């Protein structure tokens, strides 16, 4: 076991030599230490964060998410009329978000988009819809796992730049909720959705892998590595895209550019 003195010496050496941050993570990307360069004292960035009180960045982020939801549906090979209808409706909702809307109006469009998107994304399985965190079926549990992994990697990148991850631009600030992480990961969620649809088709994700306790579904412990593996693979295919998006968002926020210059995260075309 490494002594505290030796650890401190190696840690200090790392901070001097390494010109870039090294994030130590768990298997689900949860950060437990950042070594090397980080901008935790970036007071100017945080002042910009706290001064911002508009709705336009959140509106653009939600527009970006709906655009990627439509692309995720386009990536499905066999397109039924039901699927094509959903793509068109999502495209129309993107256009609605070009207008300057109030927060509740944006929330309404986001909710309508979800009701169109999720039944079509998971039309390959009997499913009662997206219900976050209540674990009422195996698809929702798998989505929660994937979103948590995505959340953790975005959190790590935002920490490196010195953002106050608890202070968002769209999600309301609640005690101990990392609202900015929730904001920035929004356009990336379809990465997880599309991968889980593929896993359902390939038999990688199935009801037999779960136990049910008091109507709450839980992934069997021995199945954890398999699920983490296919979800991690999908997220890491976008590691460069995620890094560049956070980097561009940082530069955008520091320069306080027009909302039209807000970076866009794009889902890959298949």
Kindly give the residue locations of the regions a language model identified.
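Glycine/small-residue-rich interface belts in oligomeric ring/scaffold proteins
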Residues: 1-41
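Active-site helix-to-loop segments that bind/position phosphate- or nucleotide-bearing substrates
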Residues: 39-270
């Amino acid at each position: 076991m490494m002594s505290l003195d030796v650890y401190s010496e190696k840690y200090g050496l790392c901070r001097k030599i390494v010109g870039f941050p090294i994030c130590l993570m768990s298997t689900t990307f949860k950060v437990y230490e950042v070594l090397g360069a980080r901008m935790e004292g970036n007071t100017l960035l945080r002042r910009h964060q706290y001064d911002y009180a508009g709705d336009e960045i959140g509106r653009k982020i939600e527009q970006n998410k709906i655009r990627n939801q439509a692309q995720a549906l386009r990536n499905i090979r066999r397109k039924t009329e039901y699927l094509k209808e959903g793509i068109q409706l999502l495209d129309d909702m993107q256009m609605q978000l070009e207008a300057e809307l109030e927060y509740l109006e944006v929330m309404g469009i986001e909710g309508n988009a979800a009701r169109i998107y999720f039944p079509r994304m998971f039309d390959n399985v009997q499913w009662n819809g997206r219900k976050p965190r209540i674990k009422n079926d195996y698809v929702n549990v798998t989505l929660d796992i994937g979103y948590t992994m995505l959340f953790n990697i975005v959190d790590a990148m935002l920490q490196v730049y010195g953002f106050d991850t608890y202070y968002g631009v769209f999600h309301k600030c609640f005690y101990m909720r990392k609202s900015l992480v929730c904001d920035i990961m929004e356009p990336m969620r379809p990465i997880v959705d599309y991968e889980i649809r593929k896993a359902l088709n390939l038999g990688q994700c199935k009801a037999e892998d779960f136990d049910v306790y008091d109507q709450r579904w839980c992934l069997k412990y021995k199945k954890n590595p398999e699920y983490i593996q296919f979800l991690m693979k999908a997220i890491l295919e976008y590691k460069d895209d995620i890094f560049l998006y956070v980097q561009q968002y940082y530069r955008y926020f520091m320069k306080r550019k027009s909302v039209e210059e807000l970076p866009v995260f794009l889902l890959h075309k298949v």
